[in-house]
Amino acid sequence: MTIANTPAELLASSISTLASRYAEKVQAGENADTEIASIVSACKDLDALVTPPESWNDRMAMSYTISTAIALLLNWDVFQILAAQAKPTSLETLATSCGCSKSLLRCALREAVAHRMLDELSPETYALNSRSSCLLDENKAAWIHYLTDIGLVTAAYLPKYVKSINGKIPEHSHRIALQMAFNVDETFYEFLHRKDPKRGVNFDKAMQRHIKGDAQASIESVFDFSILRPGAVVVDVGGGKGHHCIRIAKKHPHLSFIIQDYEANGPSDGEDTLPEALARRVRWQRHNFHHKQPMDGADVYLLSNILMDNTVSDCNRILTNIVDAMVPNHSVLLVDDAIDTLSEDSHSAYSSSMNLHMLSCFGTLFRTQEDWLMLFSEVAGGKLSIVSSWMIDAGRMIFALRRKF
């Protein structure tokens, strides 16, 4: 008599097979993203299958505790202390270095160990692992700190916010979860850079983590800036510290760049002094993109991760201001932004999480392809037309648009 395998055994067998495929691809130097996603999904299924429903629900509802623990450990510089020790470190030593009580630190450390953020090599003796070692990078740590600070606080107000809008996101500016959480009237960026500059500095560092990430394709990898005429002007609207323009300017010495932002404070960290030849071609201009675009007739206007932070009505205003400055059938508008592909791939879970984060901080969601097409068609009486588009990275789209008339 053959005994059928239980669902748990079938899943375990599937995980074993997938793990073998993963190992083979890694050894062959091939991309194993598909296998990684499948293994993670199958392990989650197995976890859910063998965990009692009440225990599972408790764990899901209390998932904020790891965010809290990471925030505490970052605030106490625990990861840097462990790195400086260069060996497994006792709770007693860590508590002395942090200046906090052992009982409080123990609580945070246990949570980190339970979620595989730290290793406990012997009772109350801790060490970094590959995951926590990533947080020794200042920019990567800043991103995680942002998520466990502003992200966690604003998320707590999301149910209240959604109730206030009756479950329907307005297309116009309105009071959002971030403003409720911190009791402010300012928008996200105004709050960070004017009301809470310390958090603003941390956020700027966090954004460098994304911009400098090796996995992120650059905009110049899909749009050929070399075809532009000598002396052509590229205007980066909302360009912040100028990460994109400085990078492109180094590759294309025949172009000039204007970086527009609220503060227009100059180069990013690590670029405090631009080489003279580069500095002659790159300048900053104070500009609020909700107002009239001061640079008429530029060859290229760049909007990178700007529209995702704004409601439909605000996006329409931002785009109209640029369209009014464009030369018909000449100027190019490059929109580099997030897109919701509505797929069921491994990216969709992260996209769903970030969608809730966007809703908390900006009162918006990632747009689908249909949403983007609708938005562009409604700008300035239909003056914009898409001439090219590229899907790059997971959940990221670049549109090239021209003014028709």
Curated annotation (Swiss-Prot):
Enzyme kind, highest EC tier: transferase
Matching SUPFAM superfamilies: S-adenosyl-L-methionine-dependent methyltransferases, Winged helix' DNA-binding domain
EC numbers, comma separated: 2.1.1.-
Annotated S-adenosyl-L-methionine binding sites: G238, G239, D261, H290, H291
A family per Pfam: Methyltransf_2
Pathway: Secondary metabolite biosynthesis
Gene Ontology BP term (one): secondary metabolite biosynthetic process
Function: N-methyltransferase; part of the gene cluster that mediates the biosynthesis of the benzazepine alkaloid nanangelenin A which contains an unprecedented 3,4-dihydro-1-benzazepine-2,5-dione-N-prenyl-N-acetoxy-anthranilamide scaffold. The first step of nanangelenin biosynthesis is catalyzed by the indoleamine 2,3-dioxygenase nanC which produces N-formyl-kynurenine through the catabolism of tryptophan. The two-module NRPS nanA then utilizes anthranilate (Ant) and L-kynurenine (L-Kyn) to assemble the dipeptide product nanangelenin B.
Family listed: Belongs to the class I-like SAM-binding methyltransferase superfamily. Cation-independent O-methyltransferase family.
Descriptive protein name: N-methyltransferase nanE
Species for this entry: Aspergillus nanangensis
